[in-house]
Structures are given as C-alpha cells and as structure tokens.
Amino acid sequence: MEYWHYVETTSSGQPLLREGEKDIFIDQSVGLYHGKSKILQRQRGRIFLTSQRIIYIDDAKPTQNSLGLELDDLAYVNYSSGFLTRSPRLILFFKDPSSKDELGKSAETASADVVSTWVCPICMVSNETQGEFTKDTLPTPICINCGVPADYELTKSSINCSNAIDPNANPQNQFGVNSENICPACTFANHPQIGNCEICGHRLPNASKVRSKLNRLNFHDSRVHIELEKNSLARNKSSHSALSSSSSTGSSTEFVQLSFRKSDGVLFSQATERALENILTEKNKHIFNQNVVSVNGVDMRKGASSHEYNNEVPFIETKLSRIGISSLEKSRENQLLNNDILFNNALTDLNKLMSLATSIERLYKNSNITMKTKTLNLQDESTVNEPKTRRPLLILDREKFLNKELFLDEIAREIYEFTLSEFKDLNSDTNYMIITLVDLYAMYNKSMRIGTGLISPMEMREACERFEHLGLNELKLVKVNKRILCVTSEKFDVVKEKLVDLIGDNPGSDLLRLTQILSSNNSKSNWTLGILMEVLQNCVDEGDLLIDKQLSGIYYYKNSYWPSHI
C-alpha cells in the first residue's frame, strides 16, 4: 500500500502536474486492483500516463479518491488480454522491496560513525573515507593527493576502520550529502522525509530509501484511504499463505492491476513500456561505453549471439607513424583545426543570440506603457488573491484520446476551469457572470488551443452541454431568445430578475445609461452591449418591462401595474 500516494486535482477533476511533468496518454473507465484484490470506490475513473507518474482520477469524487503511482517504483509491466467476462488488464510489477531495504541499510551504515583509513599505493598518502571500505564499495574512494582511485587488492593491507569522529567536524560531512536530500535539478535542500522536490517537483534520487525508512516508522499519508474488497482479500491472503508455505525462501512480488472496461488497453500498455524505457535511458545516459560491442574493431562479446561482455580491454598495437615528432605535429594540426571549428560555431551562435536579443529589445521598447502597468497591477492582485503558484496544465491533444467522447469530456473540464479563472472576480452576489458562447469560443481558442489544434464551434457547444453531466454546476449553458447561446453562473431567470430590479431602481434608463450603471457597480463587468440588448428584449417580450420610444431613443420602465405573472 505504500506505493499509492495522493494526487492533487482542480475543481473540474483534472490532475495538477509537477514542474517539468508532461502528460502522454489518457484512457477512461478504468478500475484499480491492488494485487488480486479490488480497491473499493476506485472502479470507475480516468487514467493518465505522464512522464513521471500513473495517475487515477475518480469520476465520482475526483478530489478525494484520486491516486498516483511513481514510474520509478515500477520494475516492468505485463499486459493481459480480456477473456469472456474478464476485462483486459495491465499488470504493474514493483521493484523488489528487499533490494530497497538493502539500499536503505547500506545508506544507514554509510552514514554511521565509521571512518576507514587507507594508504594510497601510488603516493603513499594516508586518506580517510566515510563508511567501511570493502571490495563492494561504490564509488571507489579517490586519493586526495594524486587523484587515483583506490584499488582494494593493493590497499586492503593498509585499511583501518574506526568509530572515532572529530566532534568539531561539519555535521553535513558526518552524515553525508544524501542525508540533506538535495534535488539534482534545482539543488534545493529538501526535508529528509520528502520524495519529490518542494521547489521544482523533481523526483529525488533517494526517494525509495526515504519511503522504505518511513514504512519502517509506520508513516502513512492521512489523505490516502484504500479499502480492499473482503472476498478478494480473503482469497489473496490464502494464496499468499500457500505461496509462503510452498517456498519459504522466495518472496512474492507486489503488483497492481489496471482494469480497462471500455478499451483494450493495448495503446496504454505500449505507452507505459516506452515511458519506463525512457526513464531507464535517462538514468543511464551518463554511463560511458555502456554495453559496448567492440573496441577498435575487436569484438568485446564472449559469444557471437550471447549478451555477455569481456571485462578486459584488448591491447591496441601502435603504429610507427603515431610516434615521434611527425605524430606530435599532426596532433597539433588536428587540435588547431578542431579549435577553429569550435570558435566558428561559437561565433555563429553568438551572432544568432545577439540578433534575437535586439529583436526582443525592440519589441519591449515598442510595447505600450499603460498595458505594462495594467499587467503589473493584475499580477499584484493575483499574488494577493492566489497564494498558490500555477501548476503546469494538461496538453489536450486529440491524438492522446481513444474516442471523441473522452476528448470532449476533457475539453469541457478545461473550458470550465478557464472560464472560472478568467471571470472569477465577476462571479459574486452583486454581479453575475454571463458571456456569449461566440465570445468564449474566441477567447478559449486564442488562449488555450494555439499549438495543440483549434476546436470547432460544434465541439465547443457539445463540451459546454456536458457541464451538468460531469458535475460542473457553477456554470450553465442557456439560450436567450431561442437563438443566442450564453454561459452564465446563474439561471437566466436570476439574471433577468437582477436587470428588472436595476431598471426599477433607475426608471427611464436607456441602453447607454444601463451600461454606465453596470460599469459603475463593477469596473470589470462583462455585460456586453449585445448581451444587454438580448436580455432587455426578452424582458420586454415576457412583459416584465415597458418601453417608451422617442426620437432620442428607447427608455425602459419596470412593469409594476400589469405584471406578467398575474
């Protein structure tokens, strides 16, 4: 159970990604199994594959029942196709916990009060190393004088281990650098019990060691509540007891199953395997000559078809032309040629950088000063009203979805979140938000869909019609005068009642006067002229307002003598 962790979501049910995390694939109608046991209240939701995690978002309670798994904790995956009533499943196998415990124990012993003293066989200088210096110690200690790595066979006779440590020494050197839990991406020193960086969200190198240590201390996240099905739990316990009695030496590998109810899950499993391969490649990219096949034409493999490699580097014969003064002159010419190429490339890149800097400076100077002050004021207000920093958003690309229904659901959630964030100051008790679907369509496509593909007006309407079905109740799609579609924060009758009361307080107001009153009540009012005209026309048709047509214009009065509801 320690592999599951809580996932933060938005009000519309979309996961909040970490810094640098990117979404890869999305699937719907997925259930969770821990081992062979069904996890209750997690049997219908969406599954997100990102570059760092596998995220489950529950359809019923997305803010409470959402869970996540770290890709670093997975060893490999196995796909199981469906048969009869059994749905297709993706089995996620975790890494061996015994190896993690050994890593944690080795880290604890390395940070213990043990100092190994050894003499360098090259320069005969005495060195000190934290922890016990054995044959399996990695990385190999390096001499502080000559910089040559120590050979255990040559230095084992001079190794001396002791528990004495200088009390005046720096505590960071006593407990090692790993105890500070430093992030390799932003170099921020995190708390030792945190698995992801607090600043950038990067996965910390000793996250597995931290979790194994917390498990030994019985630490549990109070936000994660996992309840397994009783029948499957009893069967799982009996199978585990039979397995342990049959093989006392072996330990069962923990695994998690993703059950796909609507799709076959093949694309999701392939994307997961590719993501695990990318993580492994990213970790091993700094290793030089890993799995080398040949050195200077000499095959390093033991067999022609085997995957075993020789540890001994073959002897390379030197030619006479590679030694002497001629060889030195040739190497000097090659060095000058390489330096010339390097400097030319550097100058080319510098010229490109300078041209880009001048264009940016020109764009900055041509910008309007008033717009700059407005943006600064908006930023100050956002910092006061929103203490939390903005998290990376999902990139809703059509190619990541299996069908159009799932794509429209995610688009509806994004439109809902975008509308609330843009007009959150207008959604109050004194000023209701109302905007035409045409204006919202233009704003959404210009702000959110450039670079990922614009949506059509029909898709925009279908997405807004899904608000009520998805449980997004703060916005509603209404039709004014049977022809104008608008998105409002309240029912249309409430909006009409507000406008009628406003005209009752200011009788004889024309269209310009009403616009000025609404703007004076709230400087950020989104009552456009078109919306106001449509609402007034609807009130006149329903008999709530009376009009007085004159040469100077049309004046509106509240119908207090012949109300329409009588």
From Swiss-Prot:
It holds the Pfam family Vps36-NZF-N. The keyword Cytoplasm applies. GO terms for cellular component: ESCRT II complex; late endosome membrane. SUPFAM superfamilies: PH domain-like, Ran binding protein zinc finger-like, Winged helix' DNA-binding domain. It is a peripheral membrane protein. Belongs to the VPS36 family. It comes from Saccharomyces cerevisiae (strain ATCC 204508 / S288c). Residues 255-288 form the GLUE C-terminal domain. Component of the endosomal sorting required for transport complex II (ESCRT-II), which consists of 2 copies of VPS25, 1 copy of SNF8, and 1 copy of VPS36. The ESCRT-II complex interacts directly with the VPS20 subunit of the ESCRT-III complex. Binds ubiquitin. The gene is VPS36. Residues 7-96 form the GLUE N-terminal domain. Present with 2470 molecules/cell in log phase SD medium. It is found in: Cytoplasm; Endosome membrane. A zinc finger (RanBP2-type) spans 114-151, 177-205. The keyword Chaperone does not apply. Gene3D superfamilies: Pleckstrin-homology domain (PH domain)/Phosphotyrosine-binding domain (PTB), Winged helix-like DNA-binding domain superfamily/Winged helix DNA-binding domain. This is Vacuolar protein-sorting-associated protein 36. The second RanBP2-type zinc-finger is functional and binds ubiquitin. Component of the ESCRT-II complex, which is required for multivesicular body (MVB) formation and sorting of endosomal cargo proteins into MVBs. The MVB pathway mediates delivery of transmembrane proteins into the lumen of the lysosome for degradation. The ESCRT-II complex is probably involved in the recruitment of the ESCRT-III complex. Involved in the trafficking of the plasma membrane ATPase. Its ability to bind ubiquitin plays a central role in endosomal sorting of ubiquitinated cargo proteins by the ESCRT complexes. InterPro entries: GLUE_dom, PH-like_dom_sf, Snf8/Vps36, Vps36, Vps36-NZF-N, WH-like_DNA-bd_sf, WH_DNA-bd_sf, Znf_RanBP2.
